[in-house]
Amino acid sequence: MEEAIMRLEGAEHRETNIHSLKRKPSRTSSTAPGSPGGVTTAKAASGAGASGVSTIRYRGVRRRPWGRYAAEIRDPLSKERRWLGTFDTAEEAACAYDCAARAMRGLKARTNFVYPMPSLDSYHHRIFSSPPMNMFLLRDVLNSQSLSPLTTFAYPPCNLSNVNDVVHESFTNVNDVCEDLSPKAKRSSTIENESLISNIFEPEPASSGLLQEIVQGFLPKPISQHASIPPKSNQQSVGVFPTMPESGFQTDVRLADFHVEGNGFGQVKYHGELGWADHENGFDSAKMQQNGNGGMFYQYCFHDDY
């Protein structure tokens, strides 16, 4: 509540100041011949016999109740007021307004002070210098002028020799780069790139990675027909197993073992396949009985022709 009351009192105090300014009698403005820079002076006609008190008013400058001066300017494009800042003296605020007006409107701007017409040389230097419309650095400009309203704003000159040196150096660098890109250099760089790519990506067959190649790697190898089909002849032949020693053999294939009886051969045990031996013709009335795993088989077995 106290803050709200203080705000209301401050608002009422501002309104009274505004009314007091509006109630001041009209002033007759005249240009004093001895005033520096054509500063406009105003004399207050308070009444007969009253001594004239001269006050200076600048364009775009307003005095704050606490004694400082605020500068602002209306933007010609957006028709809005642009805040330029608060200054200690009216001359500083007037200079800030003049800078902003000349930056927005050029030579046609209405300013508080009279400025000399810039020559062609100064205009040429101004193009290469920093942009003039820098309203946020007006304090630095005003401080360098020692608060003098008659001092003209001189922009820092641009050293064209430095610019030429920079441009010449940039062009020489471009020429060096162009010389490096000669046909020989391009050819050598192309060869190096191709060799690098060939080392990274090794050549592979056209059918690599196909499903057929993957499936064939897991399929068992086909058995040759020469080992499975017996030769035909009119005589009695003997089937010989080349991989079996004289005493017998034992294969790696885990198949069922059988007990064979008949034709005076007695009992023999074998493990694995018998090749092309035909038990029906080779063993008359043979009786085969499963008899567990493992066993031996003699090297020769007789086989009758078909």
Curated annotation (Swiss-Prot):
Record localization: Nucleus
Subunit structure: Interacts with class 3 HD-ZIP proteins such as ATHB-8, CNA, PHB, PHV, and REV.
Disulfide bonds: none
Family: Belongs to the AP2/ERF transcription factor family. ERF subfamily.
Further comment: 'Dornroeschen' means 'Sleeping beauty' in German.
Residue ranges of the annotated DNA-binding region, renumbered to this chain: 57-114
Annotated protein name in UniProt: Ethylene-responsive transcription factor ESR2
InterPro entries: AP2/ERF_dom, AP2/ERF_dom_sf, DNA-bd_dom_sf
Alphabetical list of Pfam families matching this protein: AP2
Gene: ESR2
Any one cellular-component term (Gene Ontology): nucleus
One GO process term, biological-process aspect: cotyledon development
GO molecular function: DNA binding; DNA-binding transcription factor activity
Tissue specificity note: Cotyledons, leaf primordia and shoot apical meristems.
Segments for region (Disordered): 1-46
Principal cellular location given in the protein's record: nucleus
SUPFAM superfamilies reported for this sequence: DNA-binding domain
